Amino acid sequence: MDNCELVGSRIRLGLDMDGVLFDFDSKIMDKFAEMGIQFTDVKEMSSAVEFDKSIKQRHREIYHVPGFFANLPPIKGAVNAYKYLKSLTDINNNKIFEIFIVSTPSFRNQTCCIDKINDLNKYFGPELLEKVFFCRDKTLVNLDILIDDKPEIRGFNGSSECLSDSNSVTNKMSFQHIRFHSDMYKYSDDVPIINNWIDGTYIDVVKNVCVDKNLLREVVV
């Protein structure tokens, strides 16, 4: 993004944790395997959760167990992607992003929040701990962009499914929702989506959204 210039102040970029920074689904599959329930991949588990009520109930019970969120492994490339985004500057050498963590806690899991804090500290460092939001309604958080694996972010201030259609409902959400691909969900074809943190394509996705939302402008040198 060295050919871009910030239009205003630093861009407030929110990152979800489960399924975006940390491999939530692989640990769920491991717990199912301990019960003798084997899935070949996340897609197979997703289908079972969707169509089998008993599997859906067990899926919920797994992450409600205290300690589940402790020592979740980071998704491949997530740590390096965070460091890269944090380091980016524009043509005037201004830092582009101020990065926040926005995560939904499991209130039935008494150790959820402290386990997530420890995971962040272990892999992403103590600096990020000052910028963590645990909240049930992410639409209330004042961001420019939120990267989240959910197909839709819905809450008091509206729905990210409606942001492209101004005639549908009144939206007060401050941020553009970028989806991070998960085989647990199905996504529309017309939404910005990041498929992984490894191959570098996420950079163009984020840049294009920033330009489209007039947060960055491209400069011809």
From Swiss-Prot:
Q: Which InterPro entries match?
A: 5'(3')-deoxyribonucleotidase, HAD-like_sf, HAD_sf
Binding locations of Mg(2+): D16, D18, D149
The cross-references to Pfam families, in alphabetical order and at most eight, read: NT5C
Would the keyword Signal be found if you checked this record's keyword annotation? no
**Amino-acid positions noted as binding phosphate in the UniProt annotation, renumbered to this chain:** D18, S103, K138
The keyword Metal-binding is assigned to this record: yes
- Which GO molecular function terms does the record list? 5'-nucleotidase activity; metal ion binding; nucleotide binding
SUPFAM superfamilies listed in its UniProt record: HAD-like
Q: What is its EC number?
A: 3.1.3.-
Keyword entries, A-Z: Hydrolase, Magnesium, Metal-binding, Nucleotide metabolism, Nucleotide-binding
Q: Which residues cross the membrane?
A: none
Cofactor dependence is on: Mg(2+)
Which Gene3D superfamilies does the entry mention?
Answer: Deoxyribonucleotidase, domain 2, HAD superfamily/HAD-like
Q: Name one GO biological process term.
A: pyrimidine deoxyribonucleotide catabolic process
Active-site residue list: D18 (nucleophile)
Database matches in PANTHER family = 5'(3')-DEOXYRIBONUCLEOTIDASE (PTHR16504:SF4)
| Main function | Dephosphorylates the 5' and 2'(3')-phosphates of deoxyribonucleotides.
Instruction: Say which family it is in.
Output: Belongs to the 5'(3')-deoxyribonucleotidase family.
Its recorded name reads: Putative 5'(3')-deoxyribonucleotidase R824
What organism does this protein naturally occur in? Answer: Acanthamoeba polyphaga mimivirus
